[in-house]
Amino acid sequence: MTYSYTEKKRIRKDFSKLPSVMEVPYLLSIQLDSFRDYLQMETAPEDRRETGLHAAFKSVFPIVSYSGNAALEYVSYRIGEPVFDVKECQLRGVTYAAPLRVKVRLIIYDKESSNKAIKDIKEQEVYMGEMPLMTENGTFVVNGTERVIVSQLHRSPGVFFDHDKGKTHSSGKLLYSARVIPYRGSWLDFEFDPKDAVFVRIDRRRKLPASILLRGLGYTSEQMLEMFFETSKFSLGAEVCKLELVPSRLRGDIATFDIKDNDGNVIVEEGRRITARHIKQLEKAGITELEVPTEYLYGRVLAKDMIDQSTGEVLVECNTELTEEVVTKILDAGVKDIETLYTNDLDCGPFMSDTLRIDPTRTPLEALVEIYRMMRPGEPPTKESAENLFNNLFFSEERYDLSAVGRMKLNRRLGREESTGEGTLTHDDIIDVLKTLIAIRNGQGQVDDIDNLGNRRVRCVGEMAENQFRVGLVRVERAVRERLSLAESEGLMPQDLINAKPVAAAVKEFFGSSQLSQFMDQNNPLSEVTHKRRISALGPGGLTRERAGFEVRDVHPTHYGRVCPIETPEGPNIGLINSLATYARSNSYGFLESPYRKVVDGVVTDEVVYLSAIEESNYVIAQASAATDEGKRLTDELVTVRHQNEFTVAPPEAVNFMDVSPRQVVSVAASLIPFLEHDDANRALMGANMQRQAVPTLKSQVPLVGTGVERTVAQDSGVCVTARRGGVIESVDAARIVVRVNNEETEAGDAGVDIYNLTKYTRSNQNTCINQRSIVRQGDVIARGDVLADGPSVDLGELALGQNMRIAFMPWNGYNFEDSILISEKVVQEDRLTTIHIQELTCVARDTKLGSEEITADIPNVGESALSKLDESGIVYIGAEVGPGDILVGKVTPKGETQLTPEEKLLRAIFGEKASDVKDTSQRVPTGTRGTVIDVQVFTRDGIEKDARALSIEKEQLDKYRKDLKDEYRIVEGATFERLMAALKGQEVISGPGLKKGAKLEEAYLAELPRADWFKLRMKDEALNELLEKSEQGLEDRKKEHEARFDDKKGKLQQGDDLAPGVLKIVKVYLAIKRRIQPGDKMAGRHGNKGVISAVMPIEDMPYDEFGNTVDIVLNPLGVPSRMNVGQVLETHLGAAAKGLGERISRMLDEQRKVAELRKLLDEIYNHSDEVFKVDLDSLTDKEIFELCNNLRGGVPMATPVFDGAKEAEVKRMLELAGLDTTGQTKLYDGRTGDAFDRPVTVGYMYILKLNHLIDDKMHARSTGSYSLVTQQPLGGKAQFGGQRFGEMEVWALEAYGAAYTLQEMLTVKSDDVNGRTKMYKNIVDGDHRMEPGMPESFNVLVKEIRSLGIDIELESE
């Protein structure tokens, strides 16, 4: 196995037993692929598929005028170049978007001609607003902040059959219903009521008998009965009738008379129930008709209208129940043969027949009027309006669309062969749905499970953006249609017809404020990846928290390999927000698919097939861990499999597929938890969620015990810098890496230089610090895709969210009671859990009514010391250390004329005007914040002169850019001349500076020759002359291109900024705040074991082992058994082994042992037992072995993948190799007394995360502050600078102590007694410390509330 440049430096020992069949797919592909399909930017306009923008345009255009004499057709669209790149957009606070230009064609027809001859065609490109673009990491920059559009899980369009679970009617009877859900348009529901009639609802309105809908479609009562019932034929006589016998229909009936065969033998006696045996005998006897008494007809229902042949009038209508008089009437009319509906109680009920009886309508028009009245109550119906409404409901393409998915699901559910068809409903669709519903009510067929992932589909970014775009286009369509009639007469161009505002507004609204467009969670790389892979059932067209029941939130068998069963938020959204499983993807219909390996005749192949939940249920699927032999044949007699959403066993021959990997069940976050298989699910959920809240530490440290997914997450998250092309590192410093690209990977005429500018100390959305550090050295050879620089929480290209801490499980003086954590001062000293937070503080200078605000260092009534950190423009300088209340940006605001006191008048007379007509509104550092200024940005409105600071920042940026371009040119030039040197060396010249014809070029001569003179050489070989010309041209072009780029940058920097109305200047100051770990901070392991630091203990007081090594953290052992997350204990043991091995290697290096010994030890560690992933140490050079060992000093990193991790025996073996006790326990001594503890203690290394719940952000104290308006009580919460609530239980406590005066003070002057508190303040000023409590304001509020109820209440003074 070949290792990449970074993997070689620190190889993880992998404990997995199963070979890897497929790599983890790119983690952000769900976002990127969807948006790529939406824009189709790389595709030529004529090759574009009908998806995304193209489909939206196609569905709305052509727009035809009302008269039909003009039409506007869509030709194609193109997306321009964005004005600013992503970084510039974030700085300037604008949206990263590109202009969308649409080519449309206006066609005007000749009114006079009969066959619509074309009179005029105009084609033009129309600007349709800005289209936000996705960054390469799957995010959008909207108004300068990074946002993510979360995919939505919604009910797939199609038809669903369901019942109410017996909740509607008191009898508990199941009422069945069918619902046709389109992608857009009206919903159509059919439902049974408790009396078994079928009703229809449109858009969940009032219900009507279902036959009204069918009658509206043009069916008569006879046709309806014919569609839904079979008939029995009778030929009538006066006494007896003959029934055409279909024996199977008699089953279950009670014979009302003896049934005899043709010879007169009785087969069924009167009063007996007819069974299957009787039916067989009847069939055997070959009876085709039965003589039955006329009474047998009573209660049956006529299937067809009885028409008097002579007069043509209807004697008896169809669906009439036969009674004695009806039968007599029929006989009198001389009708011999009649047909009745065949119904029974078992499997064909009289539902449609009953429905027709309650149907008041007789003609299609009456039916349409009924439907019109239901949809638009109170409007008078006309024939046209009724027909129009009905046709627009389900049969018009503009108003109704099932979409390809809906049509496929509908056809599949109704048992049809083809999966395509039209987007609107057909008559057959409606009838088939009704037939299926009635069949289900009759006991044939099953209702659907709406929580099955085969019935829920994922809407990704592209699809949601397309829908929004279509909404905008439809708004435009109306306006265009009205203007088209003018186009003919006034000769308008397409541009005059289309107003792009509504489209742009719809798109902007979606990206800016849709429920699914969320502020990106940017705590660390994992939280970014997880946020982009999130799947939410909430949002427009989805569920709401309040209404979602348990079933929707629950884990469903079809989640297997598609949606993670572990990772979901705790709280009201549990189960509604899910995470995509590691290997899952969504197919063209939007259903989630999971990959499986094909199994043929019990042999596992390497062919991988993706199956959706619909397809999967028919197959037998084995687990990834099923035992196989060398020939990949399944060895067990019975294999554990999944089949039809159940877990069962099956013989190997019956198996069709097998999982690709044990971790395909879980999401990325869950797959980062080692020994996940030993943790309780609830705790694993917390572990997965808390990893997303880990703050990047100052020095990242990779976990000693990982799962092997760390590298994938770090690289796919996009926080690292990876090489675009292979090559050699030309130069590297803190801020950029320059790579000279391999010749093979450079295209002709290309520079062959890649410059990577690193992101230094930038603020993330969560105020954590994004910083990239290069991990390559000059001269290193790298390949494409290698990690060149680590991002936040990344260590040598692997995700590193926390720190490896030496922990002991033991109680310690109650300091770790109830999940508290005791940490050693050593952790603070070594800055192990120190984090950097960056806060952005913004100062805005506006134009006010009294004049404009000014940013200046000349602030009234402020001492010299307060201004010491400001420059002459009034802005703090970079590097200043500031604390609470310090001025960052000096700003003065003009204030209105006020009445002046005599003293002020005197001052004005002496010092002139300035002092008093402005007030100080400077931007100060908020309370509780201390930090260093690391960056300042100044934005000035167009047309306003820039101050000195803005100009200096601008110059600095330009200089940096110029240096980049210069360096790039220098390297390109160097590479060009190197190539020329190689080509020209030893070649013959025709002429050249100081050369004779026919001379050979020497390397020394060329080295001396000034570079400008190289191109004066004329060579004998014509190809070389061409090369010289090309190179000269190439360098010339490059120079011009650089100048153009520089001018573009300069233009961008020097133009004014587009600021909000009324804003003159914005100054943004960035503070870097260093947060050490302290009591009150929240920390957690990866197994849901979270706690708050209770104390930081001096090193000398911490428990230590016999070698004098203290532990870093003491955890409570009681946190393990009841929580059932034993994974943390196994992690601790394996961590101890990993660290021990590291120390062993470290000792060998310090003793300067030979390389062979190191190789032997590494071989013992990496390649001992039945590991599948052997490490090929021979492929590493001695130098690489030494570098590897040096990196292993801190511990040998291990990978124990989920559900395929290290077994107990392997952990023990590792402990042995490290020279530790296999129990994993150590004798510890008390740091304060030096006595040994009574029994050995589990000591080891656990990976600890510092979560973004820091005491500094929560701690807060109030002296005086604002009060609530109504109750006059202090506000609550840190944001409002509020007070601490003294609640009812606290009042009880003071009552219990009898502390009457303290209590009175709490309830009056300290809370809401307005007069009391002002009086008390005055008293304190006068040096008199008495308080006189008055009436609390909340009592007055109570009195007012009682009065508002109409109860008279008065306060009487005694």
Curated annotation (Swiss-Prot):
It comes from the Bacteria. Pfam families: RNA_pol_Rpb2_1, RNA_pol_Rpb2_2, RNA_pol_Rpb2_3, RNA_pol_Rpb2_45, RNA_pol_Rpb2_6, RNA_pol_Rpb2_7. One of its GO terms (molecular function) is DNA-directed RNA polymerase activity. PROSITE patterns: RNA_POL_BETA. It catalyses: RNA(n) + a ribonucleoside 5'-triphosphate = RNA(n+1) + diphosphate. One of its GO terms (cellular component) is DNA-directed RNA polymerase complex. Residues 1033-1053 are annotated as: Disordered. One of its GO terms (biological process) is DNA-templated transcription. Residues 1033-1051 have a biased composition (Basic and acidic residues). Its EC number is 2.7.7.6. Keywords: DNA-directed RNA polymerase, Nucleotidyltransferase, Transcription, Transferase. InterPro entries: DNA-dir_RNA_pol_bsu_ext_1_sf, DNA-dir_RNA_pol_bsu_external_1, DNA-dir_RNA_pol_su2, DNA-dir_RNAP_su2_dom, DNA-dir_RNAP_su2_hyb_sf, RNA_pol_bsu_bac, RNA_pol_bsu_CS, RNA_pol_bsu_protrusion. Gene3D superfamilies: 2.40.50.100, 2.40.50.150, 3.90.1100.10, 6.10.140.1670, DNA-directed RNA polymerase, beta subunit, external 1 domain, DNA-directed RNA polymerase, subunit 2, domain 6, RNA polymerase alpha subunit dimerisation domain, RNA polymerase Rpb2, domain 2. Belongs to the RNA polymerase beta chain family. DNA-dependent RNA polymerase catalyzes the transcription of DNA into RNA using the four ribonucleoside triphosphates as substrates. HAMAP family: RNApol_bact_RpoB. The RNAP catalytic core consists of 2 alpha, 1 beta, 1 beta' and 1 omega subunit. When a sigma factor is associated with the core the holoenzyme is formed, which can initiate transcription. This is DNA-directed RNA polymerase subunit beta. The gene is rpoB.
